Each structure stands twice: as C-alpha cells, then as structure tokens.
Amino acid sequence: MEGKKQLLATLVGCNYAGTPHELRGCINDVLAMRDTLVARFGFAPGDITVLTDDDRSAAAVLPTGANIKRALADMVARAAPGDVLFFHYSGHGTLVPHRRGHGARQDEAIVPCDFNLITDVDFRQLVDRVPQGATFTMVSDSCHSGGLIDQEKEQIVLSTVVTDDLAVDGTTTRAARARFLPYAAVVGHLSGASGVDASHHVADHLLALFGADASAKFRHHDTPTPSPDGGILLSGCQTDETSADVAADDEAADGGKACGAVQAVLAAHPAPLSNREVVSRGRELLREQGFEQHPCLYCSDANVDAPFLCQQEEPAAIPAL
C-alpha cells in the first residue's frame, strides 16, 4: 500500500550438517529471530525469507552464495524510501587475504553452505543500492564479523567502549565452538571440487566453480568514496575475534552467544532500544557470562541512536514463543 512502510527480512542459518565444520545453533538462531521480528517488530511472515541448510530445505532455498545474494537483491529491489530491511546471518565466517599487496591485510566474509564466500565488498555494493531514506540492518553472528559492510563507519568497537573488558574467570557447562573457518580449510574444501591446486588463492577456486556468482571482490569492482548511508551492522564480534556457537543439554536451546544476547536484551526491554543500546547491553551480558567476544556497531552517525529496526513503540503484548 502506498505510503505504508515495508518491513522486509532475509534470515540465513548454516549448520553445515554432516561436514567436519558442523555447527549446532545457527538454524535455531534464525527461527528465534523470525519469531521476534513478527511478535515485537510487526514483520509479516510473508515478508520474511528464510534460508537454512537443514533437511527440510529444498535445493532452491538452500543458503548457497547465489541464493543468499539473490534473496538480498530481491529484497533491496522491493524497497522504497522509509522501508526497513533486515538481514540476519548465523554461520561460519572467515578472513580472506588480499590477492596482491596490502601486506597482511585480510577482509571479512561469510561462508554459505556451498562455500561461495560473500565478502564485505558484496555487502557494500548491496547497501549502496538501498534507496535513500530506507535502512538496511544486518546482524551477523559469525567469526570475524566486524567490518562486514566494507567502509561502514565504526561506532562501537573495543577501543571506543569504556568498560572493564577483562577476561572473566569461570566455566560454562555447555560446549562452545567458534563459528570460524580458517582460510586454509575454505581453500581445502573448494580445491576438491574446483580442480585448482590448493596452493592457489581462494579467488581462483571460486571463479572456477561459480563464475559470475562469485564475490565481486574477486572480479573487477570500483571502490567508491564512502558516504553516510542506511547500512547498519551489528556484528557478533570484532574483526579479530571469534563468535561462540553453544551446544546446550537441550538441542532446541543450541545457539550463538551473540544472537542469544540480542534476544535476551530485547526480551528484557520491550520499549524501543537504539542500535547503540542493543550492542552495548549485549556486550555487557556476554561479559557477565564470561565470553570474550565483543559485538560491534558500524553505521552512520545518524543511525547510532536511531531505534533498532525503527521500532517506534512498545508492542501491546508479546505472545509466548
């Protein structure tokens, strides 16, 4: 309807079941976030696209690199000024070394179920297509997720928060695994299918396997001068940190610690919270629980204290999930 704000979401969870890289809680994260979007923020179920790699998923909706990028492109194409776009990702992250030069610099990427990496450059190009006046909020509970929108302004990172971020003594009764795939593991996995020697850069493997569907980072792309935009990244950790995937005694309670912190913060504060508050309160909760990862916020100055997902009022009632 003309004049009515659209609320659109794409939610992705990759557990990589049956592989050496299997995680436990990524699909649970997605299901919990879907319920929260509907109950708290008023998203219509039909406007939420869910891509997971469990047995219930048809090939057409598996979270491959191409399918994720297609879903995000379709969401942005539907958007108009004033709309609220949301992307949630739970799964492995990795760091990709530059192909030439730049010393030891590495860039951030997420790892879809087919290992067709989606990089910070892809997310930058996506955000650049968001209509002016719309917002694109991204929550990524993956390792090295800080900086996943290339050139987005740092607002809350470790050096900008004055708090006692010392390691907390103590243990948890639940097993935690990092949502991180080393670069060598990514190349090793791809080389078996690409036919390219494992000594080559990951770009050679991805271009051989996926062609035009490979990340723009590995093809020619322009690097525009950054300017304020509607991109908002809430990362599960800093770019040099890992994000924890926690296996609970009850399998239904498996999940990512960063996602769990966001859910807990939202549940404890039904009234609108700013992007800054969601990240800061999530950091404090993880610190209290003894997890050494630091969620971060990247966005324009105007969006730091804007309401998370543009929530304007407290929901009348949040049904039990």
Predicted regions and their residues:
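Boundary/activation segment at the start of structured domains
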Residues: 1-105, 230-231, 247-256, 299-321
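Generic recognition of well-structured, leucine-rich alpha-helical segments
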Residues: 18, 40-44, 55-58, 75-79, ...
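Caspase-like cysteine protease fold
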Residues: 9, 188-242, 247-251, 265-321
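Short, small-residue alpha-helix embedded
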Residues: 255-267
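Caspase-like (clan CD) cysteine peptidase catalytic core
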Residues: 6, 61-90, 94-157, 167-174, ...
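Conserved active-site and cofactor/substrate-binding residues in soluble primary-metabolism enzymes
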Residues: 28, 257, 273, 277
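Catalytic cores of nucleophile-dependent amide-cleaving enzymes
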Residues: 16, 27-28, 108-157, 194-220, ...
